């Protein structure tokens, strides 16, 4: 069985922190986002920094959790700061810490290509697949089934929608607000991953 982890000190620390602060539904989403992105990279022959991508994926939504939810910053920026602090504690150099932050901030944009920023693109692909089912049909059914068995959804669609709708109300100029206004509820509700 595939584990979809990055077995480095930084990878283990990111998983530990994510498990401590995210509920099981959000934690599983983070792992699935990494897995979808890594699988996409393998299918498209994309080279990327596995540890950077994994750590960023595991903590990318911690800005949605109560301890890290900023009253002024969009959740992806708050999550980027969490990544920067976490990776500083792990001894990452300043430029790599900044990359972790950037990967998380840019994952909310769908216009970042793999050529521009491969890790940000992979996180965007992975999160879009998991949140709204975008590109899910491109993944092998056996891969998706194994992933969902190992990291079940646990009502993720409804809980995530509630989190981003809350962000949209409190921070009307953030990317989450634009996402909600653009039909997030319909896209999340139609996710084929929840129709299984």
Language-model regions, residue ranges each:
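An active-site-proximal "capping" alpha-helix that borders the catalytic cofactor pocket
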Residues: 33-35, 74-90
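His-Asp-centered metal-binding catalytic motifs of divalent-metal-dependent phosphohydrolases/nucleases
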Residues: 51-69, 79, 101-110
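Short coil/turn segments at secondary-structure boundaries
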Residues: 66-74, 91-92
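Short alpha-helical hairpin
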Residues: 1-15
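Alpha-helix N-cap and coil->helix boundary residues
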Residues: 28, 48-54, 74, 95-99, ...
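A generic, well-ordered mixed alpha/beta core segment in the N-terminal half of proteins
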Residues: 86-104
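Active-site flanking loop/helix segments enriched in acidic
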Residues: 11-29, 62-65
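Divalent metal-dependent phosphate-bond-processing catalytic cores, especially two-metal-ion Mg2+/Mn2+ enzymes
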Residues: 1, 21-46, 92, 109-196
